[in-house]
Amino acid sequence: MTKNNYVVYHLHTEQSLLDSCTNYKDYVDRAVELGQKAIAFTEHGNVFTWVEKKMYCDANGIKYIHGVECYLTEQLEPKVRDNYHTILLAKNYEGVKEINRLCYIASQPDHFYYRPRLSFDEFLNISDNVIKISACLSSPLYTWHKYARYEDGNLDDKIRDIARHYNYLEIQPHDDAEQERYNRFLIALSDSFNIPLIVGTDTHSINQYKAECRTMLQYSKNIDFANEDTFDLTYKSYDELCDMFEKQGLDKEIYLEAINNTNIMAESVEDFELDTSFKYPILYGEQDEQVLLETLRKKYNEKAKAGIINTAKAKKYGDKVKEELSVFHKVGMSGFMLFMSEMITWCWENNIPIGYCRGSVGGSEVAYLSDITDVDPVVWGTMFSRFCNEHRKEIGDIDIDVSPDQRALVYQYIIDRFGVENTAYILANGTLQSKGAIDDICRALRHKAEKAGEDCNYTLKLADEIKKEFEQDEEATRKKYPKVFYYYDGMLGCVISQSQHPAGIIASPINLIDNYSGFINADGQVVLPINMEEIHEINLVKYDILGLQNVQIIRDTCRLANIPYPKSNEINWNDEKVWADMITSPVGLFQFESDYAFKCLQNFKPTMLNHMSLVNAAIRPSGESYRERLFNHETNHNPSEQIDDLLRDNNGFLVFQEDVIKFLQDICGLSGSDADNVRRAIGRKQMDRLQSALPQILEGYCNKSDKPRNVAEKEAKTFLQIIEDSSNYMFGYNHSTGYSMIGYTCAMLRYYYPLEFVTAFLNNARTDEDIAKGTKFAKEKGFIIKAPKFGHSQNIYVCDKETKTIYKGLGSIKSMQNIAADIMERIYAQSPKDFVDVLFLCEDVRVDDKRINSKSMDILIDIGFFSEYGNLNTLKRIRHWYDKFAKRKTIKKQDCDDWLIDIIRPNAGKETEKQFSDINKPQLIKDIISILPKHKDNLQLLIKNQIEHLGYVDVGDYDVDMDIYVVQSAHKDAIISRVL
């Protein structure tokens, strides 16, 4: 590196949340443009997206330097918000690992305080593998110097001790008096301790426009740094940097040497390569393959003995297993398959049912025999090469579906099995979207105007109007509101949050903290600072444990019906009664619960599992070209009879990805591995790979064709074009088979166990619409749904098989506390004589140290939950007097009418001229209620309340007059008219 260039090492991207609007690629591109040879990223407190940054630097021929701007504290306990800044840069790969671990430590609950922090003791123990630089005006050196104002070598012990641990002292070029003063102090300190100076820019924006966007982003969040207008934090060229120092008046020789020290520092850093090898789990060392083989033998024999598999096809099973084990050996996947088998076996042993299969793994015989899936490829014709092949370049993964309420148990199993530092969740970046950007800009413009003492009309109301106009006419809206849209493009897509990706968890044979770092999120979980795409690039194994509501509905139905969760071999997949009933209602019918999907299924009239897969594929974008013809049961004709025969189960239509593999494998003679690779190449528009395989494809096709070569080649090319045209959207048959099984199982249970099924469905309803559909279905089946009642209802819906009654659960009521049912159950157990007793017990009874809140109690009263103690008006009156007196220690006579004084007197332990005290409040309220005239019930109000909170009406327990009430209800809005 030469002296007329430099290295930017103190640099922030949008990953330094709310402190930048610049993406890292902009910086790298600019560095390359300026001929700079290295770059470091020093985000606040962590190394977010560092793998992505490293990969982009490598691709652009620039050295990536691993770094962080960490926070230091003088004491971890008691917590003090000092949070000094210091730059750490990795000198070599050991330094990379050290910084990674330090970032993880800093995020621990005992360290974190507003920011992830390290103690000074931890800082002082950092090894020589890490370059330590003093950073900006938030450095401990500046803070202590500002208060002490020591000159030259006259330093106190504090400054001396910390200064000696820095490899460089950072001077900055900003046109700010305090910065200039601090620079001169650092120059003196450098002379005293022979610590070299280095120039840091504290860059936060690629250019002035992005700097303005950064300011607006901060204004929108009420962040306002004092005096920052004097700091130019944009990316500088070498000449621009020198010009800035000229304005400071520093000795030219000093700042030029400090600038060149960035080059010397960067040259001292050893480059390193990312480890992109497959990181499959290793369970038993070199014995993994042997243990997997023994597991397969054991489970195969168990299935054969139980009659689950057809032993007449033993050779077919053996050939498939042999082929798959060979592939797993070549790609190093044996330990992974073994772990999945052991994990899912553990799930079943612990009453955690798993969906039949999710994704392409449904094509693996090893997966079926080892209980990873419950889809037998020999029975269902699923394809292994779609799941894995020996030339696979991407890490394999297996997704599983579990009940949402058991998902955390499976994740914990993985963590326990691999260890905390070998497991972590994945980073998810939340970005500023269009509507949010408009809101933030309008908010920032108001803040900016208020700061300047100006009027501003960018209200929230105007922001809403702008968003609506923007959706209708983007170009016109941009012209109408130029101030807003000046910033819009520069803020759109900016990272504004970092959280846990919902997809899954990483488990690795290598220590994730050392190799990649991590941070502790608000839920106490370890999250890698790496995006999903880079997880695949570095070939870490991701375990997707997805919570599927229908698996939970099936599980809960089976529990209520007292039957085991059905396995695929136990189900009659050709039950005509189930197929006929399936198209009578969409309720609980997995993948066909929407009106459109169900209507399509009804029109098709399925009679076999493949029909469900076909309809499911057809309603997706790829099905647009053949949807109507398929639903009309037309047969499609392809370029040849061979292809027609291949696609006969699909009525001749190209529907599934596996159809492409079958064409290339069965007709064109490619291996399963080559066939899947060609399919992937077509899907990714990698036409060069297709062209290289084309001679083999055409040769194989022509060899199996009885037509002249020119005709056969034309047929093959025509079908390849059909494949290419639909490749972006084709559905997976392996995946669809498992999911159609779930749909059929729901239909089967709904038909044979309707009471239990609808109870489970209601307990798992996610929306008011689901509850309404479930309630309607129950009534169509002749079941009675009773409103929640004191002494009968639980948190969930419960069913009574003898009376065919379903009691609504309190947990399904919006705004109801989740502890309400438990509290009511405990109160009921104390046998309260009346509603007054209930109210006073509510003060004493707690669950998780919490009482039932006022809102939940109001809802329970409003829906008639306590109807055994009186009608709605009576209970509200009791509640009124309870609220008036229950918490009062004394009652002043001046606040009471004479009749009330007469009732209070016998219930008071003490009486003075002005007040009563030591009052028996329960008895007082009962006495008050006893002398008040009785009110007729307000049935109209009760009906309104039930429609609002329950979605239906149940007033059966109420003693009402002969008036008849007619209720006309459309969802929650109800028109109630009284007919005399």
State where each predicted segment sits.
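Noncatalytic, beta-rich nucleic-acid-contacting surfaces in large DNA/RNA-processing enzymes
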Residues: A38-F41, C57, S205, M216, ...
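Active-site metal-binding loops of divalent metal-dependent hydrolases
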Residues: L11, H44, V68-C70, T203, ...
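Anion (oxyanion) recognition and catalysis
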Residues: V32, D58, L124, A163, ...
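Histidine/acidic-residue-rich catalytic or RNA/ligand-binding cores of hydrolases
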Residues: Q179-N183, N207-Q218, Y368
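Active-site-adjacent beta->alpha loops and helix N-cap segments on the catalytic face
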Residues: N46-Y56, E178-F185
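Residue-level marker for buried hydrophobic side chains located in beta-strands
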Residues: V7, A40, H66, L197-V199, ...
